[in-house]
Amino acid sequence: RAPVRRHEAQAMPPVRWTFPMATQLSHLDALESESIHIIREVAAEFERPVMLFSGGKDSAVMLRLAEKAFWPARVPFPVMHVDTGHNFDEVLDYRDRRVAELGVQLVVASVQASIDAGRVVEEKGPRASRNRLQTVTLLDAITEHAFDAVFGGGRRDEEKARAKERVYSFRDDFGQWDPKNQRPELWNLYNGRHRKGEHIRVFPLSNWTELDIWQYVADDDVELPSIYYAHRREVFERDGMLLAVSPYITLMEGEEPEERLVRFRTVGDASCTGAVESGATTVEDVIAEVAASRVTERGATRADDRISEAGMEDRKREGYF
């Protein structure tokens, strides 16, 4: 074959290469992909991971992501609930039903058992709460079961202490967190190195917001406890919050219960979790409500975060979630 002369080569039409268009992920797809990568990374890297599951919206979404990460196989690690004994019945019913559906092992770490064993002392008085006592119960359960990685549903938009915490949060032999001694996380590279007795807290939802959670609930049809939607309940006002009338709370002088239409933005110990007045009965209603809100759910409804300006960070340093 005769060689192509230079002037002939210049006259040849340019070759047009066509490549298929890259699929553009929605922001929810991108968040889901990141979280599933983190969950799979932990399952591959650690010997005994566990996922905290309280039945709240964040842990419900996190468990759905774990389900997707390993489908069609089962979730390969247990879930754990640190049970204060002061729970909302609707949340416990949901927790048990969801665990049964997935066929995963449920580890219940009981604060009451810690009290009975003398590990912690229960607070007294009308403002008493078991919220802070959970730290000892959690750390004891981690030690008892030799868990080396603990998934949590914390998000950075919730509270300023969580905003500066890494996805992989190193905890020392005592379960303590030192915010000044955190490991760098470049792109999707995570350092899970630890010694025996130490463990890593892992937060796959770090980059999600409350609105992202609710949009994902709508998009993926995630079931949640009924108290996340508007319902009539007896409540009373304390320190600007609406607390549910409960056998775990002693009313103070001047506090009068009344029935109101409310819902809960976050779920925790009944003694310190407030409700908000709301008529949002559907996921779409809640999304519209959250989109218009300018206060995070913890800032608006959690009495335990109002103890001091550094209330959450102080608890996390001790080993809290």
Question: What is each model feature region?
Answer:
Residues 13-321:
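Nucleotide-activated chemistry modules centered on ATP-dependent adenylation/adenylyltransferase
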